[in-house]
Amino acid sequence: TTILLTNQILSNMFKHLNALFIGLALFACTSGAVAQTIKPIETPVPVRPAGQKDVVGLTAPKLDVVRVGFIGLGMRGPGAVERFTHIPGTQIVALCDLIPERVAGAQKILTKASLPEAASYSGSEDAWKKLCERNDIDLVYIATDWKHHAQMAIYAMEHGKHVAIEVPSAMTMDEIWALINTSEKTRKHCMQLENCVYDFFELTTLNMAQQGVFGEVLHTEGAYIHNLEDFWPYYWNNWRMDYNQNHRGDVYATHGMGPACQLLDIHRGDKMNYLVSMDTKAVNGPA
């Protein structure tokens, strides 16, 4: 009874506070007391092609052994290869990176785990396509620089592969819809590897919420702060630092938002109607 009463009180409180904040914001905008610019960004859903079904509940035929090919063995890739050496029912078939030494380094991970050497692809910016074209791979794991994520995933799905993509899976809305359309057409899984959603702590919290430990969830908060100073040398051609120097803000908001969305059943019975993004004055970053 206490929990239900508390939730009702909180619910009413948030409703009144929300109305108050909206009223204050409107007053500030119309009174001239505060100079601010509101720029709504529309993200319309394109017309879905006739006969094309969504993949929210997609199931694929069972695989006794999942054969995996990895593209990108710089910062994130080697750790992924190492993790797969511990997963029963998987086979690491192929490894690809532009730099041959990184492929060789990943091969050593397999050797250490007493696993056979995988096929190697390197030395060319198109070498990854040959990996995707193999007929003995079920899943392509993509851990390259961000701008190549979508095109690699689309190519892999078009060649009959499921794909798993490091965050972010795409850089533009056009790329996002291209991933969705390709997944729907090919009926292949296209999964964003959002580690801050699937880590132990987040999944434990989600399970507790789903079991009713917290009562009705009315408010969530999420954030992500990560000092990458120790890792800059591992990024090919300095791409990660270049991106940070040319952009500010949260460059992959799903780390903070993803777990919160899961707690609120977003896209599983509920949805976001709008998203508010606030900026601050640049100090050391780009203006």
Segments (PLM) and residue ranges:
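Boundary at the C-terminal end of the N-terminal hydrophobic targeting segment
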Residues: 33-35
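N-terminal Rossmann-like dinucleotide-binding module
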Residues: 38-113, 260
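Predominantly a Rossmann-like dinucleotide-binding segment in NAD(P)-dependent oxidoreductases
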Residues: 72, 186-191, 196-287
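A structured beta-alpha segment of the ubiquitous adenosine-cofactor-binding alpha/beta core
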Residues: 118-142
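Bacterial N-terminal signal peptides that target proteins for export
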Residues: 5-21
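Bacterial N-terminal signal peptides
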Residues: 19-29
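Beta-strand-loop-alpha-helix segment that lines the small-molecule cofactor/substrate pocket
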Residues: 139, 145-146, 150-198, 212
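Short, Asp-centered acidic motifs that coordinate Mg2+ and/or phosphate
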Residues: 94, 139, 219
